[in-house]
């Protein structure tokens, strides 16, 4: 079972639907309706932290999940979840050069983790106004995906490889290989 943290965003249920289509049982909990102790007592194999229109300060329990469980259980941060991973490890979250909402972009990647066995580049849909600043990307994190102009679109913890983030939306119909990205995350649960 996957715990899907809902940061009060409608895209959460698109993620839940995609996971269900991959035959994954999903438990959705709002970011202020579950505690770390409750999470530790659940029988889950992984956690996905959903998007949100705000910044990491709006992510509720998500920061604690990354800080205290990121070395124990596979975690995938999507959009805000991705930014929150960067923030927790000391990265600066800044305004993107351009506001991007519902726009497909060319994304280059390293072919590892959630990007395993995907063509390179892929087209992915972006909905965000914030990004992890490249210059302040923490040493603990490696950049796994990027745009043509060098904006960070994917990260992975160097030591805890199961802690990954993607800035774009795999659940968007315009994202190429979105289900495969989620399947690749599921594959790392075993």
Swiss-Prot record:
**Keywords of the record:** Amino-acid biosynthesis, Aromatic amino acid biosynthesis, Cyanelle, Glutamine amidotransferase, Lyase, Plastid, Tryptophan biosynthesis
Q: Where is the Glutamine amidotransferase type-1 domain?
A: 1-190
Q: Name one GO molecular function term.
A: anthranilate synthase activity
Instruction: List the Gene3D superfamilies hit by this protein, alphabetically.
Output: 3.40.50.880
Quote additional remarks: Component I catalyzes the formation of anthranilate using ammonia rather than glutamine, whereas component II provides glutamine amidotransferase activity.
Q: What is this protein called?
A: Anthranilate synthase component 2
Q: What is this protein's gene name? A: trpG
Source organism per entry reads Cyanophora paradoxa
Catalytic activities = chorismate + L-glutamine = anthranilate + pyruvate + L-glutamate + H(+)
